[in-house]
Amino acid sequence: MTEFQTIRIDVDDDRIASLTLARPDQHNAFNRQMIDELTAAAAELAGDDTLRAVVLAAEGKSFCAGGDLRWMQAQATADRHGKMAEARALAHMLLALNDLPMPLIARVQGNAFGGGIGLMAVSDIVIADAAARFALTETRLGLIPATIGPFVMRRLGQAGTRQTFITGSVMSAERARQLGLVAMVAAPGQLDDALSVELKAVRAAAPGAMRIAKSYALSQLGQPDADTIETAIHILADSWEGDEASAGIAAFFDRTSPPWAS
């Protein structure tokens, strides 16, 4: 496997791969390098017919805080072409993980905001620590969760989507489980034990049958197509170019409240 700088891949003797986000000092927030490395890693993993499953994990206190601050600043000042290029890279990364032929199991601790929820939405099974917290906070910045939207909406359904997309409020692991974002909530200190239980089930299933079952499920449940993703990219670019985004992002970096907050 290729050695990366922002992520790490390990494979155990049972051919279970671990894909680990490795920017703990930045709460594993996305920048363009991490997005590109995750896309490349997904291609490598997809091409290995010996793998039985992939565990998506993260170093440090947080699973993924969403967009990296410097990356977000660059988006705010980029032209429309640049904004769309970055959004398209993020969408293609999520699609590559979503389409992995083997099961993708997310091990989630700490916070998962914005794009971190996108990673959860493209996973087949999500196991979260009871203390984990989740939010789509984009509207607080004057933005919308457009690029991750096609994947998250399919996971949450209409009611969950409307609530989480509009308000940006923080939800507990139990609430995320009720909405279908999380499959299992592990008791404090028991996250790895819960993951082990799930991996035991993976080891008991026929590898080829699991791949066929996943492919069949994806084909029947309806996945984002190219037009849907392209629409999301344009909507995000529109959002980035709006006055609210300019004010919200400026307030965020100035550590002040945006003009609409009360």
Which residue stretches match the model-derived regions?
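Conserved CoA-thioester-binding segment of acyl-CoA-metabolizing enzymes
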Residues: 1-59, 95, 192
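Terminal low-complexity tails and localization/encapsulation signals of metabolic enzymes
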Residues: 1-7, 250-262
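Hydrophobic/aromatic residues within transmembrane alpha-helices
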Residues: 19, 56, 68, 119-121, ...
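C-terminal long alpha-helix characteristic of the crotonase
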Residues: 24, 127-132, 182-230, 238, ...
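A general structural signal for well-ordered alpha-helical segments in protein cores
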Residues: 35, 66-69, 87-90, 149, ...
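Glycine- (often His-adjacent) and acidic-residue-rich active-site loop
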Residues: 58-95, 112, 224
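Crotonase-fold acyl-CoA enzyme core
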Residues: 95-208, 247
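Short alpha-helical scaffolding segments that buttress acidic/His motifs in well-ordered protein cores
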Residues: 164-165, 213-216, 236, 252
